[in-house]
């Protein structure tokens, strides 16, 4: 999903002879991205609001297909369709970039996700869930020896949360509260990790 086009719009600006197509399920994200395109006067990039399951081969042939933040956070039918699109729409010498949560590294963060999901299981409001999850991470970071391997991970994770938090505060100051969530990745209902061979095979 292209979200607001934060990746492809700068590329379209810097590569005026190339053409770009961004696709996202969220109408709000597409509108925000289109506003940026209009302000820049770009003619070589288009954004499309669509469900990936409804996309057909006639969207065109691409030298690059980038799917960041999709594979691990969507159900199996969407993942399968994404792979089909790469097969159908990628140029013969094209490259597809698909990000996903990868094992074995994800095992440690997956443990934290399980704890956060359990800790926030009775909380419905997204903002309250995020704050409760942050509290848990902070508590865990303080409870584990910083020299322990798990302690090193927790402290690094806490630092990452602080960066996310500052970014989120700035967005709210700018009244940009759309579907973006502070811990969107880790608290998403679907969040699956895979070994590399499971994706490429």
What are these model-derived regions, one by one?
Residues 4-17:
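Conserved SAM-binding loop of SAM-dependent methyltransferases across substrates and taxa
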Residues 19-24:
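Conserved SAM-binding motif I beta-strand of class I
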Residues 26-28:
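Conserved SAM/SAH-binding beta-strand->alpha-helix loop
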Residues 56-65:
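A short acidic, Gly/Pro-enriched loop at the edge of an enzyme's catalytic core
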Residues 80-92:
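A short glycine-rich, Lys/Arg-flanked "PGG" loop and its adjoining helix->strand segment in the class I
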Residues 148-201:
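Rossmann-like AdoMet/SAM-dependent catalytic core
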């Amino acid at each position: 999903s292209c979200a607001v086009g934060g990746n492809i719009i700068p590329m379209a600006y810097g590569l005026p002879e190339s053409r770009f197509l961004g696709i996202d399920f969220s109408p709000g994200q597409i509108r925000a991205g289109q506003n940026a395109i209009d302000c820049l006067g770009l003619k070589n990039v288009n954004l499309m609001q669509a469900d990936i399951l409804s996309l057909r081969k006639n969207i065109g042939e691409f030298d690059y297909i980038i799917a960041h933040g999709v594979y691990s956070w969507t159900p199996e039918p969407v993942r399968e369709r994404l792979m089909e699109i790469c097969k159908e729409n990628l140029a013969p010498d094209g490259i597809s970039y698909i990000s996903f949560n990868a094992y074995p590294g994800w095992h440690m963060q997956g443990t934290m996700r399980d704890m956060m999901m359990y800790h926030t299981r009775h909380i419905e409001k997204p903002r309250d869930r995020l704050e409760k999850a942050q509290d848990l991470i902070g508590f865990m970071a303080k409870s584990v020896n910083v020299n322990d391997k798990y302690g090193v991970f927790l402290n690094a994770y806490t630092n990452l949360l602080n960066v996310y938090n500052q970014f989120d505060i700035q967005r709210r100051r700018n009244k940009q509260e759309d579907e973006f969530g502070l811990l969107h990745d880790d608290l998403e209902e679907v969040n699956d990790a895979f070994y590399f061979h499971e994706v490429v095979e």
